[in-house]
Every structure is written in structure tokens, then in C-alpha cells.
Amino acid sequence: MIAEILATGNEVLSGTIADTNAAHIAQILEAAGIEVRRHTCVGDDLDHIAAAVTEICARADVLLVTGGLGPTGDDLTTAAVARAAKKKLVLDPDAEHSMKTYFVQRKRSMQPSDAKQAMLPEGAQCIVNDIGTAPGFMLAMGHCHVFVMPGVPHEMKQMLETGVMPRIETLQGGGRLYAASRTLTVFGLPESTVGERMAGFGAALPGMRYGIRVRFPEIFIKVSTRQPDSRTAQDLAGQACQWVKKQVGESVFSDAGLALEAEVGRLLVSAKATVAVAESCTGGLIADLLTGVPGSSDYFLFSGVTYANQAKVDVLGVSPQTIETHGAVSEETVKEMADGVRRVAGATFGLATSGIAGPSGGTKEKPVGTVCIGLAGPDGVQTSHVCLSFQNRSMNKRLFAFLALETLRRKLL
């Protein structure tokens, strides 16, 4: 079954409002084994909406439309669908009843403009809106079934779940395909390298698809398939997952789509370990990442942004002589920072960073992009020194934080 999604509204078309509806609908359809071919957006124009509906219905099995069902003059979707289907608008008893019930339950008066929402294309099936005024509807146009829903996200989600998907599943009948997917997370490789290593995917795994997306500095690889039965789909997804791990290598750290901070948290829980962080160049970003994971209070104990040298001395017990001799950005300093924060917090591990995020502050010996990382644990302190610059302060800080988290992750393996 081939599906397309059509969003209507000037605000969506102009980018004033982000179209989160399309993303949600696509995820639900994919989970049901339905292939989503296109997302389309048009403004509040009767002719444009009608033309888009006509065009899409010529190539799709189902069309899901959002927006334009309200009582105002710019709510044109119902009329546009009727025009595309060459149907007249008629008062739908079910739509009228659901609207009256909505207003009575809330002790509100139904306005004359609201009655417009009960007018549906002739032959349409009303889809009741349990939490709003505007009913949705389903209308067959040749081989394509059109489902029209409100643009308000919570109303759309409710209608999609209770009124639209059950009808689509009925349309699928015995021809339903079952979807399975896995998402693998990568850190430490550029996107181009990951793409090169994925080059043989299609030949090695017929019937599987993959997609790559980047959320700097992580890369997510999603493998997916649609098969006649769920067991086959899941087995193929598992095989694809193993293939990706082998081809991409140890830079793959999760096959459950976890972000690095979540994977570190999982490993800390598994090890019954705790962590404390002393940050200089990352400015609290590591702590923010770790505490953004639900349940992080089980393993995250303490964070200190010891930006000034004196703070490193006063809070962490770093020797002034160490800073004077080696500088704040040095393996010697982060060694004492990591050891100090571990001691102060009583944590299993102490993690520390000090570096030069830029755009200024670099020297020939320590250019912008230099970061030193220290990790103190039960078996001592390890340090590392890396120089990787993206000539962007925010990106450098984020990269430094992930390098530190990766250091901890590898220690926990």
C-alpha cells in the first residue's frame, strides 16, 4: 500500500509553523507496513488544494490530509476535496451530531460559522473528533481513499489512532505488510566514511532499506523492511543490524538508537557505577547531556564548571604549580581535575575536560580545537589529548563533550 501526506495552510507552507503532523503520521504508517512516498504542502488556496488532491490520488492508495477543517474563511480543505472528487457538500448527520454534543458537554453555544464544519462531500464517511469541533472524514476517489483530519496536533493524533488507522488496516486486508526497523548509532566517523562502508548494503540484503541522518557529532543509521509476516521482517532487520556493525565497525555503539549519553547511562547502571564531572571548556554541556536522560539520578552525582584556574584549585584541589607549569589546557591539569572531582563527589568515576573551543585563544602549540580529557576511576587516572576543530565554538564544545563521554563509554565496556 502506497501512502502520501498532504499538509494545508499558509502558516505551514511559510515555515511559521513546523509540520510535526507529517512526521507523526509517517511514523505510524511505516509501523503499519505502509510505504510513504511523498509529503506535500500547499497554502490556503481552494484551487491549489484541489489540484494537489487530484494529483496525489492518481498515484497513491491512501492520502492523509491535515488542516483546513475549521470554521473560518481560510479553512478550505473540505471544499477543495469535494471539488477534486466532483462531489457537492451536504450536511452530514453524524458530523452535526458530534459537533452539537461537543458544545453541549462544554456548555457552549454553537455559532452559525461552526455549522460549516458539518458539511462534508457527498458519500464521505464522517470520522468523529472526540476532542475538538471539526470532524474528519474518509472519501473514496477511484482507487485512492482520502482521509482528512484537523491540523491541531493533539486532535489529529487522536483521530489518526481511533478513526483513521483502523479503517486503513481494513483496507489493507490480507495484503498487509509488516514493518521492522532498527536504528544504529555511530560516533567517531564522518558521514562520508559511513556512506562508503554502507555501499554494499542493497546487494547483501535484498528487501532491506537504509537511511542515514546526522545529529552532530552522532550519525544514525536506520535499517528497515516490509515483509508478509512479522517474524521474517524482524529476522531480516536483525541480519541487517549485524551487517552494519561488521561493515561500519566499532564506531557503532548502539543498535537501539540510543544517543551516546543514554548509552553511557545504561552502562553505568549495568556496572552499578556513578560519575561526577569537572568541566572547563565544555561549560556544563556534559552534565546537561547526562542529566537529560531519564533516571540519571541513579548514577550522576555532581558537576562543577571550574572555568577559572582558581576554581580548579579551590574546588578540585588542582595544584597551582601544575597549572603554572603545564597550563590549564594540559593532560597534567585534567588528570588532577578528574581525580579531584571523583574525590569530592565520592563517585566511581571522575570525568574532566579542559580545552580551547575558539574562535580565539589558540596558540601554535595549542590551536583552537585542542581538548584534554581526564578520566579517574578505581584503577587510576587516564588522560588523552585531541585536536579537532570545526572553527565553530558551539560545535567544538559539543564535540569535546562527546569525546569525553566516549572515553567513559569505552572504559565501561
From Swiss-Prot:
Pfam families: CinA, CinA_KH, MoCF_biosynth. CDD domains: cinA. Disulfide bonds: none annotated. Belongs to the CinA family. PANTHER family: NICOTINAMIDE-NUCLEOTIDE AMIDOHYDROLASE PNCC (PTHR13939), NMN AMIDOHYDROLASE-LIKE PROTEIN YFAY (PTHR13939:SF0). This is CinA-like protein. The lineage of its organism: Bacteria, Pseudomonadati, Thermodesulfobacteriota, Desulfobacteria, Desulfobacterales.
